[in-house]
């Protein structure tokens, strides 16, 4: 009687699977990434892949969480300009290079939001959940950088700035994916200047109203 093969769950094996899936995803996309190819690239047997991740949807859901943890560590900075530079020049601009896997993956993840055919897909649901967490993370980073009097007058002002910043970043992800001839560093600075001007103008308006 053949012995049942036991697959050992280890952090090393799980990381190898996620690294392999990430490498495939940024070049082959969701549809083109298969569990068997993940097994081949990771050097692990097919059974080990399914032992860790029941199916491709669950694998991609975990991959999104994995990339989100990297994103949180990378998106830091003392000013709004630093944050936008990281989001636009670093993340969106960097996503054009498949070798920059953690950034390139977010182009694929954005497709989950755009493709309605995947409405019930677990990976899509995970991306939309993580997208909300990303938003709240940025709100927590941005609000302390806005003058207190502006937030007192409009408590949603910080969230509005994050909505604007995210819209800009999403647009630049598409530009990178399309291969547009864009100087991402230049446009990151232009975007930061625009956001800073909006904040400064609102603070100035409030100051004038107070002194009138």
Segments the model singles out, each with a brief description of its role:
Residues 12-16, 20-58, 62:
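Helix-turn-helix
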Residues 2-7, 13:
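Short Lys/Arg-rich basic patches
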């Amino acid at each position: 009687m053949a012995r049942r093969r036991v697959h050992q769950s280890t952090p090393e094996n799980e990381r190898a699977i996620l690294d392999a899936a990430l490498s495939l995803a940024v070049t082959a996309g969701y549809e083109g990434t298969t569990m068997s190819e993940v097994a081949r690239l990771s050097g692990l047997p097919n059974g080990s892949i399914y032992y860790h991740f029941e199916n491709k949807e669950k694998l991609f859901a975990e991959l999104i969480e994995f990339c989100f943890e990297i994103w949180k560590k990378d998106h830091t900075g003392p000013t709004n300009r630093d944050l936008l530079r990281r989001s636009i020049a670093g993340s969106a601009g960097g996503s054009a290079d498949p070798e920059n896997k953690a950034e390139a993956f977010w182009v694929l993840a954005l497709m989950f939001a755009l493709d309605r055919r995947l409405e019930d897909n677990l990976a899509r649901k995970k991306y939309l959940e993580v997208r909300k967490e990303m938003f709240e993370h940025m709100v927590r980073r941005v609000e302390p950088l806005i003058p207190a009097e502006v937030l007192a007058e409009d408590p949603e002002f910080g969230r509005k700035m994050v909505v604007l910043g995210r819209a800009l970043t999403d647009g630049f992800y598409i530009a990178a994916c399309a291969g547009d001839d864009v100087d991402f560093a230049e446009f990151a600075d232009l975007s930061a200047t625009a956001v800073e001007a909006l904040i400064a103008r609102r603070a100035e308006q409030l100051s004038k109203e107070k002194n009138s």
